[in-house]
Amino acid sequence: MSKSRKESKSLEEYSIVSSTSRPKKKKWGLVATGVIGGTLVALYAVATPFVAPALRKLCLPYVPATTTQVKNVLKMLRSRTGIVVDIGSGDGRIVIAAAKEGFQAVGYELNPWLVWYSRFRAWREGVHHHTRFYVSDLWKVSFSRYRNVVIFGVPQMMPQLEKKLQTELQDAARVIACRFPFPNWVPDHIFGEGVDTVWTYDLGAFRKVSDLKQVASKHCILDTTV
C-alpha cells in the first residue's frame, strides 16, 4: 500500500471517530447544562424566601437568637401567665423554649420555609401540641389577645411597631424587646449586655405614667391661661 493511500485511510478513520464522538459530547454537555441550571433554580427557590424578607421595607431579617438571648427572654417570662407570642419567630427557638417552660406559644413569621422548619423542630422536640406557627405579615396581625410579646426588631421598624402595640395590647401585657429598645417607651427592666440585652415593658405601668404626664400637662396649660 502506498504512502498516500495510508494517509487517506487514516483521515477517513479519524473522520468516522470524530463524527461518532460529537453526539456523545453534545449529549453530555446538554445533561451537564440541565443539571447546573436545575441546581441554580432550586437554590434560588430555597434562598429567595430567606433573603427577600430582609430586603423588604419594615420587615424582620432572619438573625437567629443566641443561647444567651433565649435565656434572658425566659428570665423575663418568669411568673408570667398567658400566651407567649414571638413576632418574627424565625426558626422557632423562642417559641419552642417558651413551650418547654409550660407556656402556650405562638410564632408569626413571613418566611414559609422557616415556619415549616419551626413546626418540624417543635414536633421533634415534643412540644408541637403547645406551639403554633403562622405565615403572616406582622403588620396585618392583631396582637390584642396576647399577654407576653417578644420581638427581635430592627431600629427602623421600632417606632411604628411601638404605636401598633400600644394601640392593641391590654394593660396586663408585657413586651420583651431584644437587640433594640423602643424609642419612646421607658423599660421597667433591662437585663443582659451587648447584643444579648433585653428590655421589658409592662403596658399597664407605662400607661399610668403616660396618663399622669397628660394630666400634668393639662394643669400646666390651665395655669398659664389663668
Curated annotation (Swiss-Prot):
It is an enzyme of class 2 (transferase). It comes from the Eukaryota. Keywords: Membrane, Methyltransferase, Mitochondrion, S-adenosyl-L-methionine, Transferase, Transmembrane, Transmembrane helix. InterPro entries: FAM173A/B, SAM-dependent_MTases_sf. GO terms for biological process: peptidyl-lysine methylation; peptidyl-lysine trimethylation; positive regulation of proton-transporting ATP synthase activity, rotational mechanism; positive regulation of sensory perception of pain; regulation of mitochondrial ATP synthesis coupled proton transport. It is found in: Mitochondrion membrane. The chain crosses the membrane at residues 35-55. Its EC number is 2.1.1.-. It is a single-pass membrane protein. The keyword Disulfide bond does not apply. One of its GO terms (cellular component) is mitochondrion. Residues 48-82 are annotated as: Required for mitochondrial location. The keyword S-adenosyl-L-methionine applies. One of its GO terms (molecular function) is protein-lysine N-methyltransferase activity. Mitochondrial protein-lysine N-methyltransferase that promotes chronic pain. Involved in persistent inflammatory and neuropathic pain: methyltransferase activity in the mitochondria of sensory neurons promotes chronic pain via a pathway that depends on the production of reactive oxygen species (ROS) and on the engagement of spinal cord microglia. Protein-lysine N-methyltransferase activity is dependent on S-adenosyl-L-methionine. Belongs to the ANT/ATPSC lysine N-methyltransferase family. PANTHER family: ATP SYNTHASE SUBUNIT C LYSINE N-METHYLTRANSFERASE, METHYLTRANSFERASE DOMAIN-CONTAINING PROTEIN. This is ATP synthase subunit C lysine N-methyltransferase. It comes from Xenopus laevis (African clawed frog). The gene is atpsckmt.
